[in-house]
Amino acid sequence: MLAARGKEVLEKTAKELSEKYKVKVLPVLCDVSQQKDLENLVTVAIKEFEKIDALINSAGISSQHPFQDQPLEDIPRLMYTNYFGPVMLSRLIINHFIENKGGAIINITSGSTLVDPPPRNFIVYTSLKQALKAFDKGLFWEVRDFGIKVTSIMPGVTDTALTGGLKDISVDKSRLMKTEAIEDAVKFALSVPANVCPLEISVINQRTPWTRPVIPYKQAHPKE
């Protein structure tokens, strides 16, 4: 089952996947920032498929601003989409996994969580992704004995519509990751033996995709 806000892209993608893999793909309109949409999503999934094996949270938005210029309306949007949505959806589905003695939750966080301190102009975005990564790790320790896997995938800068709105990104597309790299990471997380759980998977650009440092030199080396 696929869920997204955009009806046209959602239905197109569902059709492509159904034809490619010869399986039933059900598209469901959903805004991950809305609890009622998330509740409906889980209800429909169980009704249509009876058993859910995996939850993959890949919805996300970005906002690139110095904190003093951060649009106020962006902060709740980032919080609800990048943190509230995945956490709430995990809560709505976790008892189904417990009853079935297994399942997998995969959250797409961000490669920016590997940078310390958080990249300039992305501190709200990155701090929420760090919170989600911490949630994933804590959740695994709580539910591991139910046979439930929880994985954070931390991708670098990927060639998507989201990236297209960022500043200081290289025009050399070969420096940007393709979505297939993240797809491969998800497949790996789902293919490991039942007695193994990959807690974190980092998939980072081989060559820098940025045209300027994401952390100023003085910030990274305060004692020099």
What are these regions (language model features)?
Residues M1-K12:
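Conserved glycine-rich Rossmann-like NAD(P)H-binding loop of the short-chain dehydrogenase/reductase
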Residues E8, L29-N40, L72:
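The beta1-alpha1 cofactor-binding region of Rossmann-like NAD(H)/NADP(H)-dependent oxidoreductases
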Residues P66-F67, D74-P76:
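Substrate-binding pocket helix/loop in short-chain dehydrogenase/reductase
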Residues S90, L128-K129:
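Active-site helix of classical SDR
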Residues N95, K137-E142:
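Alpha-helical segment proximal to the catalytic Tyr-Lys
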Residues S110:
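Residue(s) in the substrate-gating loop at a strand-loop-helix junction
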Residues F146-I148, S152-I153, D168-R212:
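C-terminal helical subdomain
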